[in-house]
Each structure stands twice: as structure tokens, then as C-alpha cells.
Amino acid sequence: GKPGNALMSYTPFFAVVVAIMLISLIIFKFTVNEPKFAREMQEESARLGIDEISDEDAASGARKLSGKELASLFLILASVVLWFMGYNAVTSKYSIYASAVLGLDYNMTLTIASAAAIVSYLPIGIISSKIGRKKTLMGGIILLGTAFFIASFMRSGSSMLVMNILFTMAGVGWATISVNSYPMVVELSRGGDVGKYTGFYYTASMAAQTITPIFSGFFMDIKMTSLFIYATIFVFLAFFTMLFVKHGDSAPEKAEAEK
């Protein structure tokens, strides 16, 4: 027979998600006045003497990256592709892996990873402000890659406590990456072209999320246990591309205070 959860109706869950998204949209629509906030930001910047570019340049996005900045942008975007290739392979295929390799019907492992990420977002932001985005992000990559590597040895009968600990590590590692990667991309922009750089980031991340289920599925058809090895390889490749990033970091608070 089929597992019990295979017969569940998921319509209520989707309905709740749709309702939450619609409520969020309504709140956003009636509480966020972007033109007003933009004017206030420009006025405050001018008052403090930190208005670095003209209104014309801001509107046209005319600011050009230097060669080194452009190289850093490409490396960051390559890293985004690589760690999304790794992480989303696991999130999209774990239910199949859990059933075929771990002998599990239904479990809360991915929920634990998400909960760990949510709890760690704020502390990670504080740490990033102290030691810089890049160092914090690199630590997150190591944590995520290590969790996936150890998980690749887990089999049916392995301790679920250990697996839950590994996914807690993965959740914290992923949160560390998420908190710091997008700001590193938009750090290279100016007011008028933040949208363009946001587009770069999401093009890279969504492209990876689109193709990695196909690639990981191909390797899992060959050998089902390849999922976590696949993810580990891509995550650690992202570590090496990030090593060469020289721009987009934040100045740690201590360094700022000493200026």
C-alpha cells in the first residue's frame, strides 16, 4: 500500500500559502510608499553630504564598474549559481532520497533546516557587521558543505538525531550565505541601478534552481546515493570562487570606528 501521507489532501496547505501571500501583498501595497521613501533618502543624503552621484546618473545607472569590480561581480554570481546548485538539489530531491536511501516515509528534516535558518538570520547579521560579509559567508559555505558531506554517509538505520543535527548545520550555513550574498551584489551598485543588480542576482539563483533538479536527478538515476556528494561538490566549488572576490564586502564596525 501507499504511505499514509501519500493520500493526504494538500489543498488546505496551498490555500493557506495563497492567503498569506495575498495578505502580505495588501499590507505591502498600503504601507510602503516607495516614491516618498526615495525622496526622503535623497534629502537626508544631501543634508549629510553623502549624495555621491548626481540625480541624472542615479536615474540612468550610468556608473561603470572597474575591471576588478566587474571580476568580483562575476565571481559572486558564479558562487550564487554554485551554492544554489548544491542546496536546491537537496531541498528538491530529499523526499525521494529519504524514502529510497534512508527508508523514511515522512520526516521533519527539511523543516528543521528552515527553522534553524530563521532563528539564525539576526545573529548572522550581527556577526557580519563585526567581521565583514565575506568572512561570515565563507564560514557558512564551510558549514553547509561539511553538513552535506557527512550526510552523504547516512543510510537506512542511521541515527535520525545525527541527520537532524546535520540539517540544523545546513540551515545555519544556508542562512549565513543568504544574509550576505545579495548585499555583496548590490554593494557594487548605486541608487539608480540597484534593480539591475538585483536582476543579476535573481537570474543567477533562479537559473541554478531550474537546472539543478534535472542534473541531480540524472546522477540519482545512476546512483541514488549521489545526492549529497553532488551537493557537496557544488557548495565547495562556490568556496573557491568566493576566495577571489575582492569587492562587495562590508567594512567591519571596528574598522569603521577607527577611521
Where do the PLM segments sit?
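Loop-to-transmembrane helix entry/capping segments in MFS-fold secondary transporters
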Residues: 189-201
